[in-house]
């Protein structure tokens, strides 16, 4: 078993996303970081929608490092569209990646690492869209609402009936500026509503009291703090949205 704490960060697509910032933060704090995504430039190829792929990844980590102190799912997909035109495969893809993926990840984490005597953290990025209705985001919102309740239920189960201490929680972030998902959302709004990029961004920030989106570094700081200090938040969904939830 390696001496350093080991963290698996899922979803590190590109340099400007949440996962990349989380990787940098945990590396700076001295953790051994294992990156996973559906690309070749990561430590482990991992398709969160395929059980065999997920199981292989966790087996590799156990065989290689002997421990896994935290799993931080930062992956996600948001495909906007009108309900009357929305393709079924877009719905399936959204649910599979955003919700089924969490089930497969946590299941594998428990199966491979439970009862090793170590504290464990499962802390995905969810979304304020789980609670705040937004036009054209019904699939994404439904997947994130399901994710939130999945985390609440499994936190209760793992802490009540398992010996090891588990922190199972979620960070429900608001708009994170400059990420690939943010850029795609703006592009979709521009195309669907025939508006300018400036207008699309003002629509997205209109209800945020601070008047801006989060930065990826801010999300990474919150994730590190919660993962290391947030034991009593297990089962809670932590809203990081600059007061947007207050209206």
Task: Locate each region found by the language model.
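Canonical Rossmann dinucleotide-binding motif of NAD(H)/NADP(H)-dependent dehydrogenases/reductases
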Residues: 2-33
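Active-site helix of classical SDR
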Residues: 106, 143
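Residue(s) in the substrate-gating loop at a strand-loop-helix junction
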Residues: 127
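Conserved NAD(P)H cofactor-binding loop of Rossmann-fold oxidoreductase domains
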Residues: 74-79, 243
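Substrate-binding pocket helix/loop in short-chain dehydrogenase/reductase
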Residues: 82-83, 90-95, 204
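C-terminal substrate-recognition "lid" of short-chain dehydrogenase/reductases
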Residues: 212-240
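Short, small/polar-rich loop/turn modules that mediate ligand/substrate recognition or access, typified
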Residues: 162-167, 232-235
């Amino acid at each position: 078993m390696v001496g350093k704490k080991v963290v698996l960060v899922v979803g590190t697509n590109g340099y400007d996303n949440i996962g990349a910032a989380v990787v940098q933060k945990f590396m700076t704090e001295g953790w051994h970081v294992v990156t996973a995504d559906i690309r070749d430039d990561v430590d482990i190829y991992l398709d969160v929608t395929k059980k065999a792929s997920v199981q292989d990844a966790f087996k590799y980590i156990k065989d290689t490092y002997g421990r896994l102190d935290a799993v931080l799912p930062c992956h996600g997909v948001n495909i906007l569209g009108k309900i009357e035109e929305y393709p079924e495969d877009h719905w399936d893809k959204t649910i599979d990646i955003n919700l089924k993926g969490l089930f497969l990840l946590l299941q594998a984490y428990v199966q491979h690492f439970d009862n090793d005597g170590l504290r464990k953290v499962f802390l995905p990025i969810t979304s304020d869209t789980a609670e705040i209705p937004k036009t054209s985001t019904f699939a994404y919102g439904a997947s994130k609402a399901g994710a939130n309740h999945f985390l609440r239920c499994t936190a209760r189960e793992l802490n009540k009936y398992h010996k090891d201490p588990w922190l199972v929680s979620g960070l429900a972030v608001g708009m994170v500026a400059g990420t690939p998902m943010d850029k795609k959302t703006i592009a979709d709004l521009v195309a669907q509503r025939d508006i300018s990029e400036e207008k699309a961004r003002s629509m997205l920030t209109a209800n945020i009291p601070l008047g801006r989106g989060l930065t990826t570094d801010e999300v990474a700081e919150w994730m590190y703090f919660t993962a290391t200090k947030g034991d009593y938040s297990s089962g809670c969904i932590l809203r990081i949205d600059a007061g947007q939830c207050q209206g």
